[in-house]
């Protein structure tokens, strides 16, 4: 069993430096950063749940093609954004060395056409985030493979890619906002805006100053 190191703070309080599954100990600062990234990731994915539970009223709304972005549907953007989270989490759930490619994705999945399937998929990813993130070092190295269209290999970290997955999802939520607008669907005012934008505006919405 892993032992837990306890650091004494100036105030006399104690803060555990918890070991990850591979034995690497996390400092207080790293634990805080991981908690913040986890909060952002789960909040962004929860926005998708809110969309599915409270904004969409039929499965057909998932598959209507945008007039402004040919080929785009709400369902496709939900699936694509979720893919980046699951690919990253699956990557760091395997033994090291970590190798990640965002180009290995599933298409035409049930969540693209079914609100219930999409809801289940998003809920599963939120649960996976909560299970995996606390046990991985923020600076855990991974090799990223990408097609740009040239084959590229570069070095990154788990923390950087977790941040990217959240920002990437917000980008796709903004496109969902456009498609929803075409269909006359009303969305929460914070849906599809970057966290930095919400913080700048001082909004009380999710990911604004009141939440971070």
Task: Identify the role of each PLM range.
Residues 2-32, 83-131, 138-151, 185-212:
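Short, helix-capping/interhelical loops that line the mouth of catalytic, cofactor-
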Residues 134-137, 172:
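Substrate-binding/catalytic groove segments of enzymes
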Residues 41-48, 74-88, 115-129, 165-176:
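Alpha-helical transition-metal enzyme core signature, strongest for iron centers
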Residues 12-59, 89, 177:
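A cross-kingdom marker of C-terminal helix-rich interaction/assembly modules
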Residues 47-73, 89-110, 147-157:
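Helix-loop segments that flank and shape redox-cofactor active sites
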Residues 29, 33-36, 40, 66-73, ...:
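Non-transmembrane, amphipathic alpha-helical segments
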Residues 173-191:
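Short conserved catalytic/interaction loops centered on acidic-Pro-aromatic/His motifs
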Residues 154-167:
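Individual transmembrane alpha-helices with interfacial aromatic-anchor signatures
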């Amino acid at each position: 069993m892993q032992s837990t190191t306890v650091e004494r703070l100036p105030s006399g309080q104690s803060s555990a430096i918890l070991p990850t599954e591979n034995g690497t100990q996390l400092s207080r600062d790293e634990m805080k950063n991981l908690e913040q990234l986890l909060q952002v990731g789960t909040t962004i994915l929860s926005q998708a749940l809110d969309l599915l539970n409270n904004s969409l009223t039929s499965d057909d709304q998932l598959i209507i093609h945008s007039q402004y972005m040919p080929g785009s549907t709400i369902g496709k953007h939900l699936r694509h954004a979720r893919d980046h989270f699951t690919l990253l989490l699956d990557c760091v759930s395997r033994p090291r060395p970590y190798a990640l490619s965002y180009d290995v994705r599933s298409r035409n999945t049930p969540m693209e056409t079914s609100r219930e399937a999409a809801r289940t998929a998003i809920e599963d990813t939120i649960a996976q985030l909560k299970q995996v993130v606390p046990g991985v070092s923020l600076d855990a190295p991974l090799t990223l493979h990408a097609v740009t269209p040239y084959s590229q290999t570069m070095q990154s970290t788990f923390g950087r890619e977790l941040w990217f997955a959240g920002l990437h999802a917000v980008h796709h939520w903004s496109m969902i906002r456009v498609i929803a607008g075409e269909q006359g669907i009303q969305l929460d005012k914070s849906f599809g805006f970057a966290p930095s934008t919400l913080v700048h505006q001082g909004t009380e919405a999710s990911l604004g100053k009141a939440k971070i």
